[in-house]
């Protein structure tokens, strides 16, 4: 059993955060909320999504798992106004999700979860540096880097966090000292990341006041932020681009 009501803009943002990684996901539904763990086909980026029951206007659920085509539900939610309420109910007999939004009623066919890639194991990483900054600053640096290169260097040197992109002839660099950051745990960190992935991953952070980046040297980066006034969380783990000498 699953029955819930949620703000349309919040649901759109949640779905968009997953759609940058994969097209199909397994939603794990429990009485305390919904969670998803997914990895992209190239095994470069992982998304971890949690939305507690308190993020919903109404929420009632037994433990179950459903498969959702993110492109379909994204198109469906496209007609919703930001302040609309989306009402959802699982019809277990037909394996469909009944959705009401903006006076319109939809029946969304669900996927068999067993046909979708299983949840990945989340690696336990010791990442020595941690940076907390405003999401808009992160988005701005990535947008600037896109114009120069297809990859971006991110690291910590002393009390300074930096993001840098170098092209054949041009270069862009953003440095933020401890006083410009919300928080900084200094540590040895310098890794190169693909902007093909970073560009999409940081899009949801533009509305976020605090984004936490955990970094190491030639290690994956963990990008973590809260949504729904702390009732939900989105995390991305992005593998570094290793260049041969």
From Swiss-Prot:
One of its GO terms (molecular function) is DNA polymerase processivity factor activity. Keywords: DNA replication, DNA-binding. Transmembrane segments: none annotated. It comes from the Archaea. SUPFAM superfamilies: DNA clamp. GO terms for biological process: leading strand elongation; regulation of DNA replication. Homotrimer. The subunits circularize to form a toroid; DNA passes through its center. Replication factor C (RFC) is required to load the toroid on the DNA. Belongs to the PCNA family. Sliding clamp subunit that acts as a moving platform for DNA processing. Responsible for tethering the catalytic subunit of DNA polymerase and other proteins to DNA during high-speed replication. PANTHER family: PROLIFERATING CELL NUCLEAR ANTIGEN. This is DNA polymerase sliding clamp. It comes from Methanosarcina mazei (strain ATCC BAA-159 / DSM 3647 / Goe1 / Go1 / JCM 11833 / OCM 88) (Methanosarcina frisia). The gene is pcn.
């Amino acid at each position: 059993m699953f029955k819930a009501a949620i703000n349309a803009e919040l649901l759109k943002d949640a779905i968009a955060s997953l759609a940058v990684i994969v097209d199909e996901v397994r939603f794990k539904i429990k009485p305390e909320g919904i969670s998803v763990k997914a990895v992209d086909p190239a095994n470069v980026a992982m998304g971890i999504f949690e939305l507690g029951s308190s993020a919903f206007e109404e929420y009632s659920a037994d433990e179950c798992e459903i498969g959702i085509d993110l492109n379909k539900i994204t198109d469906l939610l496209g007609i919703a106004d930001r302040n609309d309420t989306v009402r959802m109910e699982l019809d277990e007999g037909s394996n469909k999700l009944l959705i009401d939004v903006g006076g319109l009623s939809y029946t969304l066919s669900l996927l068999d979860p067993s046909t979708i890639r299983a949840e990945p194991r989340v690696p336990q990483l010791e990442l020595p540096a941690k940076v907390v900054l405003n999401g808009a600053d992160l988005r701005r640096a990535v947008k600037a880097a896109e114009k120069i290169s297809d990859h971006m260097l991110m690291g910590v040197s002393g009390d300074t966090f930096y993001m840098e992109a170098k092209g054949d002839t041009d270069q862009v660099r953003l440095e933020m000292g401890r006083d410009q950051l919300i928080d900084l745990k200094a540590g040895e960190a310098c890794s190169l990341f693909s902007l093909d992935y970073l560009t999409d991953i940081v899009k949801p952070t533009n509305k976020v006041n605090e984004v936490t980046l955990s970094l190491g040297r030639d290690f994956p980066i963990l990008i973590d932020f809260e949504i729904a006034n702390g009732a939900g969380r989105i995390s991305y783990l992005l593998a570094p681009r290793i260049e041969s000498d």
